[in-house]
């Protein structure tokens, strides 16, 4: 299928938002705005929806700040459940643009894999990661691209993170049922 993408630098391009909002044929991936608040980015999504296209996926791709060093951006994946709670929109995480490099952590995992797991465990619905057969030859985003031979490893790691999320979700459901039983008055009281 086809999905339109509005990148971070166009999140406040209101003429573009109007045009894309009026075209209901394709869903839209709207990335969080560059240098604006979460609320301002969510308002851009609302602007799109008000023009008629409510098939919006909200993209988190990190925030530009010096607190992100040594990564390109400060990872904002703690906002995954916040966006879902406030809007009910599906959420896409973009670990490649958040991290911006292929650095490997001391445990052997790539930073982008750690960040991907964070977003998935937080409940992300979609992941956008850069892959390239020869990252050094890529015209854009080469330094952050994973290689094609790394794809099976990446997908297995994603499956592990997803299983952890599902376990956590089931635990929350069980606790909610337990709390509901405790809150119900007993017959004959």
Can you annotate each of these PLM segments?
Residues 1-17:
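Active-site beta->alpha loop and helix N-cap motifs at the rims of alpha/beta catalytic domains
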Residues 12-131:
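Catalytic alpha/beta core domains of metabolic enzymes, predominantly
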Residues 66-68, 101-103, 133-142, 171-182:
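Flexible glycine/acidic-rich beta-alpha junction loops that bind and position SAM and/or redox cofactors
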Residues 113-115, 143-156, 181-188:
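Short, electropositive alpha-helical surface patch
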Residues 134-167:
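C-terminal helical cap(s) of enzyme catalytic domains, especially alpha/beta-barrels
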Residues 155-189:
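Surface-exposed amphipathic alpha-helical tracts and adjacent flexible/coil segments at the periphery
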């Amino acid at each position: 299928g086809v999905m339109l993408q509005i990148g971070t630098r166009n999140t406040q391009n209101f003429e573009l938002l109007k045009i894309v909002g009026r075209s209901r044929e394709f869903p839209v991936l709207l990335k969080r705005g560059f240098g604006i608040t979460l609320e301002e980015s969510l308002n851009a999504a609302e602007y799109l929806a008000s023009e008629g296209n409510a098939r919006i996926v909200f993209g988190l791709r990190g925030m530009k700040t010096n607190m992100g060093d040594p990564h390109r951006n400060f990872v904002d994946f703690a906002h995954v459940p916040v966006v879902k709670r406030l809007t009910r929109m599906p959420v896409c995480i973009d670990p490649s643009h958040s991290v911006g490099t292929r650095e490997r952590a001391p445990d052997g995992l790539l930073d982008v894999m750690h960040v991907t797991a964070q977003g998935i465990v937080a409940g992300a619905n979609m992941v956008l990661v850069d892959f390239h057969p020869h990252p050094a030859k890529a015209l854009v985003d080469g330094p952050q691209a994973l290689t094609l031979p790394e794809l099976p490893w990446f997908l297995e790691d994603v499956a592990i993170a997803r299983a952890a999320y599902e376990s956590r979700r089931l635990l929350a459901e069980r606790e909610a049922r337990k709390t509901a039983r405790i809150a119900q008055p007993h017959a004959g009281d």
